Amino acid sequence: MEAPDPGQPLYLDATARDTPSIALGCAARETLRMADLLDTMLDDAADALRRSDRAAIAQVRKQDDALDRLDAAIKRYIAD
């Protein structure tokens, strides 16, 4: 079984957008998840650079791409 894409939002509920306070709560929850992913990515990046591990650096780039996708999804959710 393939691991879920961390760049896909888990908490942005389209049906909650009818109630702004709930929608903002969903966005806040997703933003907190994004912060956790960023913390992990920064730890992984520091470790990869210390070891000069090209494969680990490539994995950090994938983590960064996932964060970019998640950031864009949160912005779309708030703006629409």
Where are the language model's segments positioned?
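Cytosolic, long alpha-helical scaffolding segments
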Residues: 1-80
